[in-house]
């Protein structure tokens, strides 16, 4: 294939995007990505390994470059071929058959209607948790959780008439000679006071 656009230029200096644009313009029709890549490889004379290394960058460049358009199914064309208004139609594809078929209307269901003929659609909120039934069955005459006088612990009675201790009493207990050095300080304080 001879692309006249690149006459006088070395093929090693050309980017894959430039060659892709020229190939699509030469064929004047959209091409599959694999076919486009194969033609680029043939034109540039690159090995399979060199193309594989640059393939992901080439695909990214196709997506980013504004002169290319994806037509679905990994088919690519030039954006200049499609007027602005027809881009959506070209990329969406043929869906006329689906639009002609009448759509099924969905029936609205009201879960709070009582006395309807179709009881399958009505939700019974009183009986919605099977675990509740299991708990009710487990309850027996011995499973009563209420407090009874038998639960009173005679070995450890709780007395209400304990000596009331206030915060001052507790602090004075803590303020005592915990470290054994308070007596020396107290004597020094007395000597200072006498002088």
From Swiss-Prot:
GO annotation, biological process: DNA-templated transcription; regulation of DNA-templated transcription
Region (Disordered): 91-195
Claim: Transcription is one of the keywords in the record: yes
GO CC, one annotated term: DNA-directed RNA polymerase complex
Molecular functions (GO terms): DNA-directed RNA polymerase activity
Keyword field: DNA-directed RNA polymerase, Nucleotidyltransferase, Transcription, Transferase
HTH HARE-type domain ranges (all copies): 14-81
Acidic residues composition-biased segments: 116-171, 179-195
InterPro entries cross-referenced by the UniProt entry: Asxl_HARE-HTH, RNAP_delta_N_dom_sf, RpoE
Family statement drawn from the similarity comment of this UniProt entry: Belongs to the RpoE family.
NCBIfam families, sorted: RNAP_delt_lowGC
Function: Participates in both the initiation and recycling phases of transcription. In the presence of the delta subunit, RNAP displays an increased specificity of transcription, a decreased affinity for nucleic acids, and an increased efficiency of RNA synthesis because of enhanced recycling.
Subunit structure: RNAP is composed of a core of 2 alpha, a beta and a beta' subunits. The core is associated with a delta subunit and one of several sigma factors.
Name the UniProt record assigns to this protein: Probable DNA-directed RNA polymerase subunit delta
Native source organism of the sequence: Limosilactobacillus fermentum (strain NBRC 3956 / LMG 18251) (Lactobacillus fermentum)
Gene: rpoE
């Amino acid at each position: 294939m001879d692309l006249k656009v690149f006459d006088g230029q070395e093929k090693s200096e050309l980017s894959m995007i430039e060659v892709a644009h020229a190939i699509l313009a030469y064929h004047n029709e959209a091409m599959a990505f694999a076919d486009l890549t194969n033609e680029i490889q043939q034109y540039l004379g690159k090995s399979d390994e060199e193309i594989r290394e640059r393939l992901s960058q080439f695909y990214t460049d196709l997506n980013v470059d504004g002169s290319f358009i994806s037509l679905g199914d990994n088919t690519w064309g030039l954006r200049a071929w499609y007027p602005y208004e027809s881009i959506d139609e070209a990329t969406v594809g043929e869906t006329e058959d689906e639009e002609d078929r009448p759509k099924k209307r969905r029936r609205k269901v009201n879960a709070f209607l009582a006395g309807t003929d179709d009881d399958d659609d009505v939700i019974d909120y009183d009986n919605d948790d099977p675990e509740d039934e299991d708990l009710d069955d487990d309850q027996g005459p011995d499973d009563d959780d209420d407090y009874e006088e038998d639960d009173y612990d005679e070995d450890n009675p709780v007395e209400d008439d304990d000596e009331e201790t206030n915060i001052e009493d507790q602090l004075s207990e803590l303020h005592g000679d915990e470290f054994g050095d308070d007596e020396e300080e107290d004597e020094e304080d007395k000597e200072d006071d006498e002088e």
